[in-house]
Amino acid sequence: MAEAKTHWLGAALSLIPLIFLISGAEAASFQRNQLLQKEPDLRLENVQKFPSPEMIRALEYIENLRQQAHKEESSPDYNPYQGVSVPLQQKENGDESHLPERDSLSEEDWMRIILEALRQAENEPQSAPKENKPYALNSEKNFPMDMSDDYETQQWPERKLKHMQFPPMYEENSRDNPFKRTNEIVEEQYTPQSLATLESVFQELGKLTGPNNQKRERMDEEQKLYTDDEDDIYKANNIAYEDVVGGEDWNPVEEKIESQTQEEVRDSKENIEKNEQINDEMKRSGQLGIQEEDLRKESKDQLSDDVSKVIAYLKRLVNAAGSGRLQNGQNGERATRLFEKPLDSQSIYQLIEISRNLQIPPEDLIEMLKTGEKPNGSVEPERELDLPVDLDDISEADLDHPDLFQNRMLSKSGYPKTPGRAGTEALPDGLSVEDILNLLGMESAANQKTSYFPNPYNQEKVLPRLPYGAGRSRSNQLPKAAWIPHVENRQMAYENLNDKDQELGEYLARMLVKYPEIINSNQVKRVPGQGSSEDDLQEEEQIEQAIKEHLNQGSSQETDKLAPVSKRFPVGPPKNDDTPNRQYWDEDLLMKVLEYLNQEKAEKGREHIAKRAMENM
């Protein structure tokens, strides 16, 4: 009887709140119908506000109420909301023995429960935003004034009232207390049973995924073994087929197609590389052609520069000779010979070569020298000029013998101004500076005249060098006479001519030192002697005869035309009666020197082209 009383008491207590809920639901539905009639747009909004999860929660809540109503074991101070978690745990464990029968409830009870669920579903969307507002941690309203250190002891009465209205399972995901830590909330949500279920789920997932990976690895290994076996079989078949057929491969169609495609790709790559190499070679050849054209242009420009230098040099000689005639008066012939003395046989040979290369007659060339004109650039020479392109590059003997010319000073053209006496030590046997000076038609250093004035008449006109002391003032010096500038200008002209001769002599000396094989020591015969000023006419006739004999070997016309030239530009005086033989030997020596210069020029050109090609590569 006691059990029956407690059962009916629990049912009565559960029906009392249902009655209140039904009355409130009827009132709310009446108001809602009025609102829907007034505002038809609100109907669509309310239709969308019925989510299916809320209905599921309502049904679960109904089932929990039914289980609480039919629960046999209950305490005297029974709270209907304290036993909500017990049926849930029983449901998770799968214990269906304690579930009561569903037929025990009447139809009226079911209708009341459904109406209550509908009322809760209507009121929850409106009250949810008010109730589930997050706590603002910075606001002072949420914090109590007398807050203790242990924030767990703080009680929240408002939240208790709300929990009395709704079971705690509805607010599992919401944060009730803002002062609780996250890990504490998680510990409250996850029970040991839920953790055990999760662990079992993960274990099952591991079991499901593990065999798949193992199966895949096994399949890959089997496939590799299968391919290796197939390769071995193909190799054995190839060997057997080669023995039978005679060298042909036995491959399946797919392998043949793959090999053909690979060969085609390789051939295409090789063709592309060959085409690129051909294009690169064409570009390089084009660059080399451009370089050769540049070298030709440079050689032509250098040729014109050399010709202009020779013409300017000869013009200077002619002007110096003319000025000497005007100043000397009665001694005009000796003055012309004096000015024309630096012109040696090599300059005459250079004039002949220039006339041949430029295809200009000697007479016209002499007239151009007189007037100072240059030949037209349209006339192309048949072969290159015998003069080297760059004398500084050819004179490499200085690099091997740095002490050869110590006291020299380079001029604008690159020739040294003063001859060095240290070169006599580097000369080969049978060759000396005296031989080179004799070859150039000049006198040796021992037999050289003291001054350019052979007679006392010219020496008297030379300004005596007055001593200048540190103690004397410049006002006590003698004033210059009116004729002093003429003498100074004439002396400057002499010095310029002497510098040119010295430069040419040193250049030939370097060439002879570099190529000593052109000299035969058995043919050199030094005969010391000194020409006197009284035998100048006889010396000129002998030189003229020697030049005529040399030029008769080439052509008779040029000798007739150059005879007055040789008279006008005589060479240095001979030393003895063996002048013709010595002159022939000098001419042969000059020809050899010029040949070697041409060879060296060609070698230099080839080296220059090779260097440019290597730089471009």
Curated annotation (Swiss-Prot):
Q: Which UniProt keywords apply?
A: Calcium, Cleavage on pair of basic residues, Glycoprotein, Phosphoprotein, Secreted, Signal, Sulfation
> Where is this chain primarily localised?
secreted
The reply to whether Signal figures as a keyword in the UniProt entry is: yes
Propeptide part(s) removed at maturation, as residue ranges: 28-30
Segments of this protein annotated with the region O-glycosylated at one site: 182-200
Matching entries from InterPro entries are given as: Chromogranin_CS, Granin, ScgII
* GO process annotations (BP): angiogenesis; endothelial cell migration; eosinophil chemotaxis; induction of positive chemotaxis; inflammatory response; intracellular signal transduction; MAPK cascade; negative regulation of endothelial cell apoptotic process
Q: Name one GO cellular component term.
A: secretory granule
Residue spans with biased composition (Basic and acidic residues)?
A: 257-284, 293-302
Gene Ontology MF terms in the entry: chemoattractant activity; cytokine activity
Record keywords: Secreted included? yes
Modified-residue entries (Sulfotyrosine), positions: Y151
Tell me the first and last residues of the signal peptide: 1-27
Kindly provide the PTM information from the record.
O-glycosylated.
Q: Which residues carry this modification: Phosphoserine?
A: S174, S268, S432, S532, S555, S556
Q: What does this protein do?
A: Neuroendocrine protein of the granin family that regulates the biogenesis of secretory granules.
Similarity comment text for this entry:
Belongs to the chromogranin/secretogranin protein family.
Record protein name field: Secretogranin-2
The encoding gene is: SCG2
